[in-house]
Amino acid sequence: MELRQLRYFMEVAEREHVSEAADHLHVAQSAISRQIANLEEELNVTLFEREGRNIKLTPIGKEFLIHVKTAMKAIDYAKEQIDEYLDPHRGTVKIGFPTSLASQLLPTVISAFKEEYPHVEFLLRQGSYKFLIEAVRNRDIDLALLGPVPTNFSDITGKILFTEKIYALVPLNHPLAKQKTVHLIDLRNDQFVLFPEGFVLREMAIDTCKQAGFAPLVSTEGEDLDAIKGLVSAGMGVTLLPESTFAETTPRFTVKIPIEFPQVKRTVGIIKPKNRELAPSANDFYEFVIQFFSKLEQYQ
């Protein structure tokens, strides 16, 4: 069994067409067909079956694909480790982040890191809270910046970088807009603008409202921070957001108000796999991030 055969197999399985796989891999169609046939002969099973003009995986082919993907991911990771061992200052760091940390925090820390390690490259993946945790566990990314920092996973370790307050964001013409602080219960009759189901910032907002003694009336949803802030600015409702999402400014026609009760904070940090050694460049970045935030007064 050869790596070439496995890569051909994965490409055909994804495209369900030998000629398309051949075009993408820049090899002859006959070469792919021959290698797939050799693989099936070695395994003594049929991996594909024809369905019209396309070919589909057989049940055993689907099972084989799962293991091939896992094996190829491990092999690619091993090659990356060797490359970085030979030159640890020229690696690639694959880091994930949520939308709430995209505008200021991530660019700031990467820019500072690049000053010391100019030849290290970054592959950035934005995703939801649960997606980022699974991506670290599955080796799709090396590290993830996120909040809150998870503490209940046996295969993930996290380091808290800072703790931040949660604020109420209301339209400029809101009755409470001129108050210096707000009790969250005072917003119980307002309509809320939140992220959709499955987003951790939605869960945070709902849990905070429950601590205040009410369930928020969610009238509008937005899938990113700009949408949420824009809807509040347009008078569609109020929302709750962490301090770091404001990036030193408050959106036009809105007011950011500290919540006096309940006083809720969230942790923000960086996570990495617990039982897997990071490549040198990824480990350098992990250690750099921890030191970077320990020196920043604004995050203390």
UniProtKB/Swiss-Prot annotation:
Per UniProt, residues of the HTH lysR-type domain are 1-58
Q: How is its activity regulated?
A: Activated by alpha-ketoglutarate and inhibited by glutamate and by RocG.
Classification via CDD domains: PBP2_GltC_like (cd08434)
* Any GO BP annotation: glutamate biosynthetic process
Which conditions up-regulate this protein? Answer: Induced by glucose, repressed by arginine, less protein accumulates when grown in the presence of glucose and arginine (at protein level).
Query: Matching PROSITE patterns, A to Z?
Result: HTH_LYSR
Query: Mind naming one GO cellular-component term on file for this protein?
Result: protein-DNA complex
Keywords on this record?
A: Activator, Amino-acid biosynthesis, DNA-binding, Glutamate biosynthesis, Repressor, Transcription, Transcription regulation
The molecular function terms in GO held by this entry are: DNA binding; DNA-binding transcription factor activity
Q: Which residue ranges hold the DNA-binding region?
A: 18-37
Task: Name the Pfam families for this protein.
Answer: HTH_1, LysR_substrate
Q: Which PANTHER family does the record associate with it? A: HTH-TYPE TRANSCRIPTIONAL REGULATOR CYNR, TRANSCRIPTIONAL DUAL REGULATOR HCAR-RELATED
UniProt function note: Positive regulator of glutamate biosynthesis (gltAB genes). Negatively regulates its own expression.
The record's comment on protein family reads: Belongs to the LysR transcriptional regulatory family.
How does this chain assemble?
Answer: Interacts with gutamate dehydrogenase RocG.
State the name under which the record lists this protein. Transcriptional dual regulator GltC
Gene, per the UniProt record: gltC
